[in-house]
Amino acid sequence: MIMAKMDIRLSADQEKAAEAIISVIEKKANGTLRGEEMLLTMGGFAGTGKTTTLASAVGMVANRPKIAFCAFAGKAASVLKTKLERAGTLALGDYVGTIHGLIYRPRHGGSSGSITESDIDDKAPVERKPITGNTDQKMAFDLVDDIDQSIIVVDEASMVNEQIFADLQSFGYPIIAIGDHGQLPPVIGSFNLMEDPMIRLEKIHRQAEGDPIIHVSRLARETGRIPIGVYGLGVEKIQKTGSLAFAERIGPSTMTLCGMNVTRVWWNNFLRTRYGFKSNDPEIGERIICLKNNREEEIYNGMTGVITSIVAKGQHWYKISATMDAGNLYEGWCYKHQFGSVKTAFNVPGMPQWQVGDLFDWAYAMTVHKSQGSEADDVVVMEERISRTEDEWRRWLYTAVTRAKKKLLIVGS
């Protein structure tokens, strides 16, 4: 099968997957979609051409219904939008963005909107307000009444938890869920939408069979063990020792990944110092990562950017302007004590959720869970086994190494 618009020839497994996607779209358009056809799941490991197959299939259907293309993480949604635009897949009325932006609206008094200077309480106690790390944010959102599209495509579907999937299903529209069934499941609960996908892409397309990153990803996925050694130009694993000499290869554009938040905080502090940032406060030019969605400001969990201006206000806030990697400009009030904290400030005792403001932290290092949906040319992975089961470990390691596009350094044993 050849997708003429994109001049792409699909392989046999991609063609089978494309036909299944086309069937859902066409049956929805002519009203013949049966109940058991309301969900289609397509899985594929790194490099199998999942987005290419999706774009090809959608582009083959004339006069199709409007489609909502969405992903859990803002970064993943941004990457998806870029790929679909490049393929010429999008049509008038389609949606491309986060799941939260598609089906939720901030509840009055919730934590997902913006605060203004008038909301800043200068009389707040001067002591640092503790962060509890309570991650239950569901009370801050309500479901919208309906969406403008009649088909939902979920990318990076391995990140979707059971509650969000149930909310997506509640609209009664067919769902096409696409993801890498080798990656980590959602952080909360045992639900895994990609555990046993209905359709699987098997053949590697994104990079040559001999690509060292693909080889390393297979080792991670199949054995959970990557031996010490050099696997190709810029791709190697070294023994973890007490020396930090390897850190010299970490640059400002390197994605540094780890398993635990305490490790993330340590590396953020170490790299900040190395880059010449001496203050305990964030500074102009620093890389930051968003930790909480704010639709009003078009910032989403996992989105990264660079600070262009920053002013402290009161004891608990910064007024920050930043250029986000997705291309948008951010300006808003951020909770000061989130920077350098091990936990995320979803619940600050003595302060209403809406007054906490936006949540950012330094982005020189991040956990593998937070990196899902992102990719970088250069990646450094700090292996941290902690208490994971064998399957969890394989998924963690596989997810980590598949963030790399060109260079990969693994530090472990």
Where are these regions (language model features)?
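Conserved adenine-nucleotide phosphate-binding loops and their immediately adjacent elements
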Residues: 1-8, 43
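Conserved helicase motor core of SF1/SF2 NTP-dependent helicases
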Residues: 41-48, 52-65, 71-87, 97-111, ...
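Core RecA-like ATPase module of SF1/SF2 helicases and allied nucleic-acid translocases
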Residues: 48-52, 74, 89-97, 105, ...
